[in-house]
Amino acid sequence: MTGLFITLEGPEGAGKSTNREYLAERLRAAGIEVVLTREPGGTPLAERIREVLLAPVDEVMNPDTELLLVFAARAQHLAEVIRPALARGAVVLCDRFTDSTYAYQGGGRGLSLERIAALETFVQGDLRPDLTLIFDLPVEIGLARASARGRLDRFELEGREFFEAVRNAFLKRAEDDPARYVRIDAGQPLVKVQQSLDTLIPNLLELSRG
């Protein structure tokens, strides 16, 4: 039995975590096993790598170092959480996955997409999400929401130009593979966003039941 791998992507302040919980609640109400996880992180070791990636420090992190840390955390996450959950038939809802690497390290940092793709294949093999939800909103709204949450992490401290590149990278990936991606207008009030998610539930239930 093979599970269903759904990733939630988008820039800062897009509401991915809140809406991941909402989707999980709806699927569990229908009797579906749901595993909630996130990247970077998802296991104790991967969460320690997350701390290194997000903590503001005086030393400038080399973009290649950042990229390798992201994939190191992902390798552990896949081995310990994602692959076992999918193998037993669960629905995995993951807050960020490799699309964020293409957006942040590729779009934001300007790293080679070919290099990212090579690491993607090395770490993931042929595993790709079954469905990716892109929670999209204007950069200024997302940054205002992130600032309202309190102390900013190392990525949230980046400037508007960085986040415009991140947003554009997400949208380009969705445009290039419309069969896998669904864009959600995350600039709407939460109730409207969740109404958009409600329209996806019947299809998700059908997919999760094979």
From Swiss-Prot:
Pfam families: Thymidylate_kin. InterPro entries: P-loop_NTPase, Thymidylate_kin-like_dom, Thymidylate_kin_CS, Thymidylate_kinase. GO terms for cellular component: cytosol. It catalyses: dTMP + ATP = dTDP + ADP. It is an enzyme of class 2 (transferase). ATP binds at residues 10-17. Keywords: ATP-binding, Kinase, Nucleotide biosynthesis, Nucleotide-binding, Transferase. The keyword ATP-binding applies. Signal peptide: none annotated. One of its GO terms (biological process) is dTTP biosynthetic process. PROSITE patterns: THYMIDYLATE_KINASE. One of its GO terms (molecular function) is dTMP kinase activity. Belongs to the thymidylate kinase family. Phosphorylation of dTMP to form dTDP in both de novo and salvage pathways of dTTP synthesis. This is Thymidylate kinase. It comes from Pseudomonas fluorescens (strain Pf0-1).
